[in-house]
Amino acid sequence: MDTVVFEDVVVDFTLEEWALLNPAQRKLYRDVMLETFKHLASVDNEAQLKASGSISQQDTSGEKLSLKQKIEKFTRKNIWASLLGKNWEEHSVKDKHNTKERHLSRNPRVERPCKSSKGNKRGRTFRKTRNCNRHLRKNCCTSVRRYECSQCGKLFTHSSSLIRHKRAHSGQKLYKCKECGKAFSRPSYLQTHEKTHSGEKPYACQSCGKTFLRSHSLTEHVRTHTGEKPYECGQCGKGFSCPKSFRAHVMMHAGGRPYECKHCGKAFRCQKSFRVHMIMHAGGRPYECKQCGKAYCWATSFQRHVRIHNGEKPYKCGKCGKAFGWPSSLHKHARTHAKKKPVSGGSVGKSSARPRPSTDVKSQTREKVYKCETCGKTYGWSSSLHKHERKHTGEKPVNAASVGKPSGGLCSSKNVRTQIGQKPSKCEKCGKAFSCPKAFQGHVRSHTGKKSCTSK
């Protein structure tokens, strides 16, 4: 019978196959291979191990190694890559659990129980001694928090954490942006802010390709594709995909306004409204244009202003390719491609001098969720559905539009009163009633003999 070596029983994966395995399956693969080596080592057949070139049967002193020593040397030395194929070396870059020196060689968890300062053993174990020491320095097990904030009483484990916390009370901001001058209390906040100037957005959506500056913004955006709404209101059952919208909704039920101005006492339900109010008190506009000197409160407004100077036009028409610097300009341009042009309420059918909002463009992109139960036709607006349902019911609303006259003003009120037969203006002398005040005034002058105007 031929000698069985480790290469005869090892299972090798290609790069494509290894990428399809999840972390649990990879861990299972490592455990099975380690268990296989244990069985071969327990047979204590020198030919089996020497044939694979895996490990020496004797140490440097010439003494024969025990089974436990063989396994320990196998797991600690960089032998996984040579025994289990090239994929162990190639996959080590993609494996998120790799180490600096041993790419995919996962050592078995060495039992190094955590000990607190009192000597009480804890259940957590560490693979490396330095990780255990780092854990002890954090005082996680002893829960010793020696640094207390004098203002709010909050406790901290490290003095540096207390110093960062005190900046929130004092408003101290040491880290300043070189481009716009805005200051921050933490360097991580400054690094995130600097990306707004460079335009870097490292987090991209795989569904639509939209990029984001922060990871949580990408997470909230992905929920718009999946329809996930993990934040549900306990009172009305309404779901939200964003925690900020959920908190604002809860405040509406509670009627509370947590953001209160210290200067005037005015309270706000939304943090953004509160920030705008505080800027009005401070009178500061941190975003100033270097070319014309105009200042803005918000970075988005400042960025839109900069486009005027550099001629940037990011809003492009999908039909003709024409670009615009403002989204409102793009909406107005898109109406020229639409079949229907917005008209005023006048009876002559002339277009209004001031264009109305782009309802034609919005109606093309808006999701049609309102469905007619009679014919099944869908609409994007509830008002459009109500108007459509009147065709089935035969209902005719009492308004000025039913008589073909423009709505609004005194004439509109007269037309409505004429339809319903209402005549509120009554003459005290003859008892005649009128629906229009102007006609009533002319009738009163007929009794007095006065004329509204004289001819020369």
Curated annotation (Swiss-Prot):
GO terms for cellular component: nucleus. The keyword Zinc applies. The keyword Glycoprotein does not apply. CDD domains: KRAB_A-box. Its main location: nucleus. Residues 93-114 have a biased composition (Basic and acidic residues). A zinc finger (C2H2-type) spans 147-169, 175-197, 203-225, 231-253, 259-281, 287-309, 315-337, 370-392, 425-447. GO terms for biological process: regulation of transcription by RNA polymerase II. It is found in: Nucleus. Keywords: DNA-binding, Metal-binding, Nucleus, Repeat, Transcription, Transcription regulation, Zinc, Zinc-finger. Disulfide bonds: none annotated. Residues 4-77 form the KRAB domain. Gene3D superfamilies: 6.10.140.140, Classic Zinc Finger (3.30.160.60). Residues 343-352 have a biased composition (Low complexity). Residues 331-342 have a biased composition (Basic residues). GO terms for molecular function: DNA-binding transcription factor activity, RNA polymerase II-specific; RNA polymerase II transcription regulatory region sequence-specific DNA binding; zinc ion binding. It holds the Pfam family zf-C2H2. Residues 93-125, 331-365, 386-406 are annotated as: Disordered. May be involved in transcriptional regulation. Belongs to the krueppel C2H2-type zinc-finger protein family. This is Zinc finger protein 556. It comes from Homo sapiens (Human).
